């Protein structure tokens, strides 16, 4: 028995979907514990690509129970659309395979309207939100006036809460943000349909998970976004609205920290970021464009082009520390094929001072310049490599450099988007 947490180790988009898909083979339960449909996990099975924003990636494996925990914010329309997409492809043959915790909060139309209107009003000071209502939903959750899944499936409770909330939201939307008011009748009518469809999936995730663990079943906790976007530990305010570090797996699903055995951080062989915020190793030249093109670096949720840069060990060490990572899964290593040299940032330079620790002060971080070590690239394709030993020697050396500068062992290497383009150095479920 082992319980493993998967988290992003950079600014999101690290390839968590594929790694979760690989590790699901060893799990009995797969749990999403934070975020919402601002995440996008891309899975490639054979010639078929599936993109999931809410439902755990393990859903592509028959017989694996997939749970949406209390820490997630749920857009019911997106959720039901994903179910339809999956069933059309022959997945989710048994509805019991999917569970939503009743304490998960619901994204309402006014959350999305507020999210978009705020960004428009912010202009140059915008955060770079996806506009999907994630932040405003978490705001209402923390303010203790959110609408939960359990409220949605009780019609009287839902109508009462909408009546209480909507006048205030409309006032703010109209009078301050210059938006259009929303109709109570339309919201209730639309969401009542969702409630009838959702009801069969609602259960208590915490009870189910703790029973699974007590019975010796393997649980995989699937994080979204990345550690450097954490609401507390990330590059605030250019962060997401939930806890993206490994500790969020406990608070977002209702299990204790003592049941977690391994924490695997997913990390690209280079770095990307979507939206605003500091990015010390960002490339604005032909190399940056090459990484974007070769890595197909466009958001699966928004379609926005991702910013690209060299591997940042300073940021990586921060992510390893705040999540207690026991291993790294390195993705998109094949994107670096054919490069003569590869830069690895090992420290920052700030006003003549060498910084080896990641600054939390954004005024400092914005002024930091990367200090690079050069590593020789490899000129051969990685296709066909099935073990560490069958990788080109210079690719092996790059992996060892990543381990050295991050202080964490590499346990998996992805050399392409397919399942079979994966090298496992250690299985975190093996105890």
From Swiss-Prot:
Annotated metabolic or biological route of this protein: Purine metabolism; AMP biosynthesis via de novo pathway; AMP from IMP: step 1/2
Subunit description: Homodimer.
Residues binding substrate, per UniProt: 300-306
Gene3D superfamilies with a match to the protein in the record: Adenylosuccinate Synthetase, subunit A, domain 1 (3.40.440.10), Adenylosuccinate Synthetase, subunit A, domain 2 (1.10.300.10), Adenylosuccinate Synthetase, subunit A, domain 3 (3.90.170.10)
EC number: 6.3.4.4
Matching Pfam families: Adenylsucc_synt
Subcellular localization(s) per the UniProt record: Cytoplasm
Organism name: Syntrophotalea carbinolica (strain DSM 2380 / NBRC 103641 / GraBd1) (Pelobacter carbinolicus)
Active site as annotated: 13 (proton acceptor), 41 (proton donor)
Binding site for IMP: 13-16, 38-41, 130, 144, 225, 240, 304
GO process terms (BP): 'de novo' AMP biosynthetic process; IMP metabolic process
Stated name of the protein: Adenylosuccinate synthetase
Keyword Endoplasmic reticulum: no
